[in-house]
Amino acid sequence: MNYNSINLVKTHLINYPCPLNINFLWNYGFLLGIIFFIQILTGVFLASRYSPEISYAYYSIQHILRELWSGWCFRYMHATGASLVFFLTYLHILRGLNYSYLYLPLSWISGLIIFALFIVTAFIGYVLPWGQMSYWGATVITNLLSGIPSLVIWLCGGYTVSDPTIKRFFVLHFILPFVALCIVFIHIFFLHLHGSTNPLGYDTALKIPFYPNLLSLDVKGFNNILILFLIQSIFGVIPLSHPDNAIVVNTYVTPLQIVPEWYFLPFYAMLKTIPSKNAGLVIVIASLQLLFLLAEQRNLTTIIQFKMVFSAREYSVPIIWFMCSFYALLWIGCPLPQDIFILYGRLFIILFFSSGLFSLVQNKKTHYDYSSQANI
């Protein structure tokens, strides 16, 4: 057993063969793993002093911040880590879209399942501080599920956000990261089943071991992200936080604008630019499903050969518009829903889905041997 464990570490962490020409864009997975581990540690420490009851939830957060030794540090590190996880996740997906990672369907789908778990975990975690923005944000999102009354009752423990809601959200927020951690190991297994891609898109026999060559590249990226993480945790959390969330919940007063965290803004833009809440919810779910469909591009291209090339590095035009429309929706989700933003939001939603569906029928030139996952 001891020998098998050592052999597993040597195979997947030390002697794992990597392409010689990969660059810093391949650091995001390693950085995500480190930040996610920090999130779990800080979350466990915070959970030990948090009270999931509506009369004490807000005050338990204030107790952690003001009275517990270094409690403010753990609280701000946890808040900053959530933003950093999504920032690195978006970059990780962006790199996958650009460098043919979607041709590995099992790796791609397992990664998107982790992304979906991150979304659910972050949302229910945003409710736990029980400030004004947390309460009303939870009310708005749970009202979207009113088309399925039994689901609302099961999730909230009633027809409105109340004490059973925060208890259930706390339990889910504690459990889901460990579920995501299990899928992370599955994701790594599927990745190592074939091997890492590279910027050129050529499967080459010229490879080097992960240690010490590429580990030094990952450590360099970790040093940079650690500096950013600590500076933001210590100095930058308060100016970027919502002031309304520092106020005790008042169920009779609605904030001027209910705005989620920045990493939810693209999906929030889809919700607020569509007049029907059920249609908005369907569009949000469809936007995530579209990413899953990209894994089937490998199969669809055997039927339809439609290639659109942009620049010498062969980025496809649909994928570029797909990414640009996503970041445009991120910007549109922040301001008040005025007519001009609603118009642009709908236009970018159309562009988002049309470019994503267009990319399904393009044929990107690749020289990889995907036989390990070709018949899955």
UniProtKB/Swiss-Prot annotation:
Binds 2 heme b groups non-covalently. Its cofactor is heme b. The keyword Transferase does not apply. One of its GO terms (cellular component) is mitochondrial inner membrane. GO terms for molecular function: metal ion binding; ubiquinol-cytochrome-c reductase activity. The chain crosses the membrane at residues 28-48, 72-94, 107-127, 169-189, 214-234, 274-294, 317-337, 340-360. One of its GO terms (biological process) is mitochondrial electron transport, ubiquinol to cytochrome c. Heme b b562 binds at H78, H173. It is found in: Mitochondrion inner membrane. A ubiquinone binds at H192. Heme b b566 binds at H92, H187. Its main location: mitochondrion. It comes from the Eukaryota. Keywords: Electron transport, Heme, Iron, Membrane, Metal-binding, Mitochondrion, Mitochondrion inner membrane, Respiratory chain, Transmembrane, Transmembrane helix, Transport, Ubiquinone. Component of the ubiquinol-cytochrome c reductase complex (complex III or cytochrome b-c1 complex) that is part of the mitochondrial respiratory chain. The b-c1 complex mediates electron transfer from ubiquinol to cytochrome c. Contributes to the generation of a proton gradient across the mitochondrial membrane that is then used for ATP synthesis. Belongs to the cytochrome b family. PANTHER family: CYTOCHROME B (PTHR19271:SF16). The main subunits of complex b-c1 are: cytochrome b, cytochrome c1 and the Rieske protein. Heme 1 (or BL or b562) is low-potential and absorbs at about 562 nm, and heme 2 (or BH or b566) is high-potential and absorbs at about 566 nm. This is Cytochrome b. It comes from Plasmodium berghei. The gene is MT-CYB.
